[in-house]
Amino acid sequence: MSDRPGVDPITLEVVKNALASTADEMALVIMRSAYSPVVRDTMDYSTALCDRNGRVVAQGLTLAVQLGTFPTLMRYVLEEYSVSAKPGDVYIANDPYGCGGQHLPDIYVIKPIFVAGELEGYAATMAHHSDVGGIAPGSIAVHATEIYQEGLRIPLSKLVDGGVENETLFRLLASNTRQPVHVLGDLRAQLAACRVGERGLTTLLERYGPDAHLYLDELQRVAERMMRAELALLPDGVHAFTDYIDGVGDDPEPIPISVRVEISGDEVLIDFEGTSPQVEASVNCPVGMVYAACYCAIRGIVRGEIPNCEGYMVPIRIDAPAGTVVNPVLPAACGARGVIGYRVYDAIMGALAPLVPDRVLAAGEGGPTLIAWGGYQRGYDDERIPFGTTEVLVGT
């Protein structure tokens, strides 16, 4: 697996599996602790561990098409907080346009991990929350024309500062949702998962001491090398495909998602030139999820036990033109971005089908079906108490 001097391949495998087990344990904590069905039952959430440079080193076995979103967000975390981070801090974000988020219900909670006073890594979680405000229960209205109609935008902020919770931010979140008990409960499940990730990574770093980062770096190198080796086995060439989703509005025209997959040596370029401009509806897909769908597609068609870390993403280059449905710009609505995100995956499968027909997935239903409903029930003294729920049906 590794040919680097000073790196013991058995220890490398132990480190890799320890990291993966910790990321999976984080995922189980969320599943067991979450309040809302969309997290607890649908498992619409993700977990990851990152090294001190913010690179993903392990991912929980949760929602595959979302796992590749962490690198986009972590770049913003490093830019904003890498110098000022301190023990006990926890960050929160959901903004697609300010910090690499996806759509507003997907809230990220990130905890920097310190060992002996030094920043050594991060525990990262994302969960689809049942409601963050906006014009429709569940915060996903396909007829929304701009993001300001979809709910609360959370810029990258401190949810916990040096171990002290930001009560103002907790109250702000509770005041902008129809489901405060579910949202705050799921948020605390994410906090608990981050603490589990912190414990697991700390134990690993203390066990191996200064050599630990040698092995974390080597995992990235091995993943990149193995991905390049797999891509090099494929013949050079360009493969194109265009898929469509139904349009929206009174006189809808089909919305094309055009993809060109170019394999050159040990790299691949995925180009979305020709894809529809962004639309005045909530199906626009922020680029973070588009990247994740691309990584997921390529990761799925290659062979070999490639470490599930950020290194395998390096040979995969992506060009998604700004202002399109695969890279919208403010103020485009994006609540139903999964419709495009999953179709991006399908389009890549369509492009690669003639090349590796035995490895691509057959086309699914083309995207997730999300059902959200809500209303009000009478409480004491005729108080109007909101209720609601969100369910996601995905067969892909």
Where are the model-predicted features located?
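Glycine/proline-enriched, intrinsically flexible loops and inter-domain linkers
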Residues: 1-87, 92-269, 273-396
